[in-house]
Design a protein with these regions (language model features):
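Conserved N-terminal architectural modules of multi-subunit, DNA-dependent RNA polymerase core subunits
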Residues: 1-540, 546-749
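Conserved tryptophan-centered aromatic signature that marks the ligand-binding surface of SH3
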Residues: 540-541, 830
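HINT superfamily self-processing domains
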Residues: 546-549, 553-562, 566-567, 578, ...
């Protein structure tokens, strides 16, 4: 029962009971509603959603990105008129997928079900087709002034097969839900979310990557001799499916007499470019304007040291003062080699290549030149602040800065790569057909590409074999990109039912598992609630392979256009001609997916408005909205790969859920989806937050934390955990009492590091110096026998337990924790329960420490060496034999024998045993 404050009174009928301090069923009612009727879909939801988004959206966008393909032959080029006599334009459209089929040897075609694919070692895959529109432009005449256009369409051209994820939208099992499981051969409790490749079940592990469109500042002085600080960003636009373009802004380690100059490293440019040269290439010419774009307010007293640090860059770039000179300088380092063209054309093409880099490769997530200019200034500003320790360097291991690439994204990257190869091969083949094709005998231009030569031009095996190989081997790496993506696809673990579900929720960091870096393996505080803290392998994969918590959701791509429309009334765009750098300073910047759009004069109103739209479901409920008041930024993200999790909303120190809602949940009147938006209630009950939103929230672990026990309480909680157990993954959540130690762990007591341990060789060694593999003499607490044991584990660590110093009458001192057990006359007793001067403890007969004092009062000799010799002389023993016994007794520390010898009690027992009946 939770105590919720109503009208300043505590209602003790809700989710938490203070008197008993125990949860009852209500938190589980909410969790049960999450899984109810959808428990299988929920557990592999991230896999299915990602794949469905790939086949329904990403794959179509990727194909459209290549339109149109322009093909010309150099043999048809007229250098006088600078035209081609024949041009071919090819566009792809109407992408379609078909049900998986089996083509039998007798010519029969039938529907393929997953079970048959398993049994017959088939690949469960769907055929893909596209329509190809071909446009020929034919120019004739002396000056090629006459042009004729011929259009042709080739329909349903096969481009390969795409492996199908079980239970996805295009899976047969999903389309034929009414068919009984006995007919399909499937288990009704199978969650899906995996592939069948050559009869083997394969699941794809989510791959961690650095979040795109975010600026990261690092100190690289230790590992780099050229630069001391760097700010880096990987940019991708919202509207296109392209590979990220990385831009680095770096501070040189070399002092040019005026300080350390700043350089920019751009894609497809061989050498780093001075910062001010890049600004001038973008149209900002004077040094003062450039400094204003970086610092915004150059007269601010806090910016004096930052302004001085730019002096080296000003001097470094004073040779190139115009936009034309700056672009020409950048062009000289462009990775472009003119082929089969004169010098003048080559220079022109190389200049166009550079302009394309500035337009499309430099910050492609920025939509206008103005946004690029301000973003370059923002990036430099962040770098300078980090260098002078005004802000902290970024944390590579924080989950705020990470994204998870799921099956859909990984397959789309492969598909884009192989479709690009298919298009390149197509261009080469069409060129050959134009130059040497059979159409030349009849000048039938329409038949340059026809159904006869089409499958030589478009090779369907390119995409099919590429995707199949990646899923079969687990190697998702792309050759020309040095990406470490081995072991991405794995054979599904079928050891137990729950292990197969857990395998589908696994996440891996694409790094060398044998590497000795510690930070990537540690449990980062930002992954609380998103990744299971317990479920990770032992050995070299520890911390590299992780598992999602059981309520974690991974976002997929969603349209960001509505976000741009919603924030427009609240912001002043950077393109506004009246906006100056001084106006931007001290105003709140507004970012959407890393793109700096403008500033807001009323940021709180914008923040609250966006939050309300999220609660109402007007914008995507998985959208991240953060007001960073320290950096004066509002950051809005709806990109794919963010980890999100549900938490209960708290408003005015009240959880927005009551008994009526709980009753409706239990009765089935309300389902989980009703709790996510305010369509069914005045307020949404549950909010999905990502690690960045979580870092700006105050989340109560239990509802009782929210109760206002005193009017002086200053904590203002924003959210509350549904239940603390939701931090665990599927496997760890099945462990009973996970907050308790396992029983063997409770028996691990501690001794002081200086305590001596007896080795099997008779040598005594400090316990701190014991190594794994050493053989020690151990004592079994039940059989009461000693044995030689090999050390397998060794721990040295601080303890919070009480530490006791035990001194015995014999002079032995032992330092041990309160729970360390000793053998006493009444059995095994912990140190804390020993009673001084009363309890008798058993210690190994060999002294580990010399006797320091005599607790018996007067020290007296019981048997001296002379007494021993004289006694045996009287018995007529030979002197040689007597001296042999003397030597042995001395070795045993029994001669001379004093009344404080710790072996007297043993001698007494032996003596009593001899004299007894």
């Amino acid at each position: 029962m939770v105590n919720i404050i109503k009208n300043n009174k505590i209602d003790k009928s809700n989710m938490y009971n203070i008197e008993t301090e125990q949860y009852i069923e209500e938190p589980w009612s909410i969790i049960e509603s999450y899984f109810k009727g959808h428990h299988l879909e929920r557990l592999v939801r991230h896999q299915l959603e990602s794949y469905n988004n790939f086949v329904g959206y990403q794959i179509i966008k990727t194909i459209e990105m290549f339109n149109p393909v322009h093909i010309v032959s150099e043999n048809d080029y007229d250098p006088v008129n600078k035209k081609h006599s024949l041009e071919v334009f090819i566009t792809f459209e109407n992408f379609q997928m078909y049900r998986p089929q089996i083509h039998e040897n007798n010519g029969a075609i039938k529907l393929m079900f997953p079970q048959e694919a398993r049994l017959r070692n088939f690949t469960y895959a769907s055929a893909m087709t596209i329509d190809i529109n071909i446009k020929y432009i034919i120019r004739t005449g002396v000056n090629l002034e006459n042009s004729q256009t011929i259009c042709k369409t080739l329909s349903k051209i096969h481009i390969g097969k795409l492996p199908i994820m079980l239970k996805s939208n295009i899976c047969v099992l999903n389309q034929y839900k009414y068919v009984e499981h006995t007919h399909t051969g499937e288990c009704k409790y199978d969650a899906g979310g995996y592939f069948i490749i050559n009869g083997s079940e394969k699941t794809v592990l989510g791959q961690e990557r650095t979040a795109e469109n975010r600026v990261y500042c690092f100190n690289v002085a230790k590992n780099n001799t050229k630069y001391i600080w760097t700010a880096e960003i990987k940019s991708v636009p919202d509207t296109k499916c392209i590979s990220p373009k990385q831009t680095n802004v770096m501070i040189s380690s070399k002092n040019n007499g005026f300080g350390n100059a700043i350089y920019v490293q751009m894609p497809r440019i061989k050498q780093v470019i001075p910062l001010f040269v890049v600004f001038r290439a973008l149209g900002v010419l004077t040094d003062k304007e450039i400094c204003e774009k970086i610092l915004l307010d150059i007269n601010h007293p806090h910016h004096k040291i930052l302004l001085q640090s730019l002096q080296a860059s000003v001097i470094d770039s004073n040779i190139y003062l115009t936009q034309e000179e700056s672009i020409k300088y950048i062009t000289s380092f462009a990775m472009y080699t003119p082929i089969n063209m004169d010098r003048e054309t080559g220079i022109k093409k190389k200049l166009e290549f550079t302009m394309d880099i500035l337009k499309n490769d430099l910050f492609p997530h920025c939509q206008t030149i103005t946004q690029k200019i301000y973003f370059l200034g923002y990036m430099t500003n962040r770098l300078l602040h980090a260098r002078f320790e005004l802000i902290k360097p970024d944390d590579r291991d924080s989950y705020i800065n990470k994204r998870i690439d799921l099956t859909g994204t990984l397959l789309n990257n492969l598909f884009r790569n192989y479709f690009n190869k298919l298009v390149k091969d197509m261009e080469k083949q069409v060129n050959r057909e134009i130059n040497n094709g059979s159409w030349k005998s009849t000048d039938d231009y329409e038949n340059i590409i026809n159904l006869t030569n089409l499958y030589k031009i478009i090779k369907s095996t390119t995409i099919e074999n590429g995707l199949k190989r990646a899923l079969a081997t687990g190697d998702f790496g792309i050759k020309h990109i040095n990406s470490n993506k081995v072991g991405v696809a794995q054979v599904l673990n079928r050891l137990t039912y729950i292990s197969s579900l857990s395998h589908a929720r696994r996440v891996s960091t694409p790094t060398d598992k044998s590497g000795k870096l510690i930070p990537p393996r540690k449990l980062h505080n930002t992954c609380w609630g998103y990744l299971c803290p317990a479920e990770t392998p032992e050995g070299q994969s520890v911390g590299i392979v992780k598992n999602l918590s059981y309520m974690t959701h991974v976002t997929i791509h969603s349209n960001s256009q509505p976000l741009y429309e919603y924030i427009t009334p609240y912001i002043i765009k950077l393109e506004n001609p009246e906006l100056t750098s001084i106006n931007i300073f001290n105003k709140v910047k507004v970012f959407i997916n890393g793109t700096w759009l403008g500033i807001s004069e009323d940021p709180y109103e914008l923040f609250i408005s966006l939050k309300e739209k999220k609660y109402k479901g007007i914008i995507n409920i998985y959208t991240s909205i953060v007001f960073d008041y320290k950096m004066k930024e509002i950051r809005i993200c709806n990109d794919s790969g963010r980890l999100t999790r549900p938490v209960l909303r708290v408003k005015n120190k009240n959880i927005l859920i009551d008994n009526d809602m709980i009753s409706k949940i239990n009765s089935g009147e309300i389902i989980w989806d009703n709790l996510l938006t305010s369509t069914s209630f005045p307020e949404s009950i549950i909010e999905y937050i990502d690690p960045e939103e979580q870092s700006w929230s105050l989340i109560a672990t239990k509802p009782k934390d929210i109760i206002n026990y005193s009017s002086e309480q200053i904590l203002k909680y924003t959210h509350c955990e549904i239940h603390p157990s939701s931090i665990f993954g599927i496997l760890a959540s099945c462990i009973p009492f996970p907050e308790h130690n396992q029983s063997p762990r409770n028996t691990y007591q501690c001794l002081d590091i200086n305590e001596l341990v007896l080795l099997s060789s008779g040598e005594k060694k400090r316990i701190a110096d014991i190594n794994i593999g050493d053989e020690v003499i151990s004592f079994h607490p039940e059989t009461m026998e000693t044995s030689i044991t090999k050390v397998t584990h060794h721990y040295i660590r601080e303890t919070i337990k009480k530490i006791y110093n035990i001194k015995t009458i014999s002079g032995r001192e032992i330092i041990a924790t309160e729970d360390h057990k000793f053998m006493t006359s009444s059995g095994w007793v912990e140190v804390k329960d020993l009673i001084p001067t009363i309890t008798k403890i058993g210690i190994y007969m060999n002294n580990c420490y010399p006797i320091k004092n005599n607790s018996f009062g007067t020290l007296s000799c019981i048997l001296s060496e002379d007494q021993f010799i004289n006694f045996f002389k009287e018995q007529n023993f030979k002197m040689k034999l007597i001296m042999k016994y003397v030597s042995e007794l001395k070795n045993q520390e029994l001669l001379p024998l004093y009344n404080n010898n710790n072996k007297i009690s043993i001698l007494s027992r032996i003596f009593g045993f001899i004299l007894s009946d």
